[in-house]
Amino acid sequence: MDKEHQMEGKMEQSRHTYQRESLSLALSMVLVSAFWILFGPVAVQLIHPIGLPYLTANAPFLAMGLGIVVSLRFLLARSFTQLATDHSRFRFPLFGRAFLAYFFTATLFLLFFFLSDPDSIDIHPAPLRQKLLMLLLVVVITPMQTSSEEVLFRILPVRIVTGKTLGVGKLHRLFASLFSALLFALPHLGNRELTQAQSPAIVLCYYALFGFLVTSMSLQSGGFEIALAVHAANNLFVALICNYQGSSLPSLPLFESTRALGTWTDLAQLTAGLVAVWLACRSAFSSPQAPKD
């Protein structure tokens, strides 16, 4: 009987702990969203007179990032590393492998597009001094922007679903990945890419696939290093190497693509990039077996 009471007590304590953590995570989502929605437009008004479209486009994410800092300090009472991974340290080698695999794949596709249709890839005209200034801004701001999006639209909601650890069973992991796919697709409904796309359905599928597959890999690895790396690699490649006409994040890249948006080629590139990431990071997926659903 004593053992049964002890077991029941531990289960009850675990349930209360999960409820408290879920509540703090949910409140953090609300707080970060409030900073983004309420203070984002204020940041845009303050930064717009500078005359740099890239800074103006990223202004709302500065507000979002501030909300995350406040949330970590006062609601979650934990470090960013503790939020981002179940491991004792942030796994920079894993982050680096995922980043390079995705970035390298994007570079190969750019080379393919240039060789198969040279007229679709133009050198972006801009003075060298402006490009160097843009380089400094992008290297600092873009990782902040992508990390902020990851926290709000992937890390916090997935943590709510999985509980204390990311090592959950298959059904739990499937639900968390589907939830992430939905959350990644919805905020992009207002993007220019959707209105200018040859097929808006393909663009939405692109965002959803990005949300689902990257979350699935993150859960299997026991941390969000892969998600943070892939998102940063994607946006840094767009901002620095090859952007496209009508981009939601205007920059001064080396090249500009005039290819149509929302084509099956876009999905093929995303799939190839994520397959490359999986191959580069597969050693991280051999984590201890999660409890069965």
Where are the regions a protein language model picked out?
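Cytoplasmic juxtamembrane interface segments
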Residues: 8-20, 69-75, 81, 194-221
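Residue-level signature of transmembrane alpha-helical entry/exit and packing/kink sites
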Residues: 21-29, 53-57, 61, 94-98, ...
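Hydrophobic/aromatic residues in alpha-helical transmembrane segments
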Residues: 39, 43, 67, 108, ...
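Hydrophobic alpha-helical transmembrane segments of multi-pass integral membrane proteins
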Residues: 63-71, 99-110, 178-182
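Transmembrane helix-loop-helix hairpins at the membrane interface
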Residues: 135-293
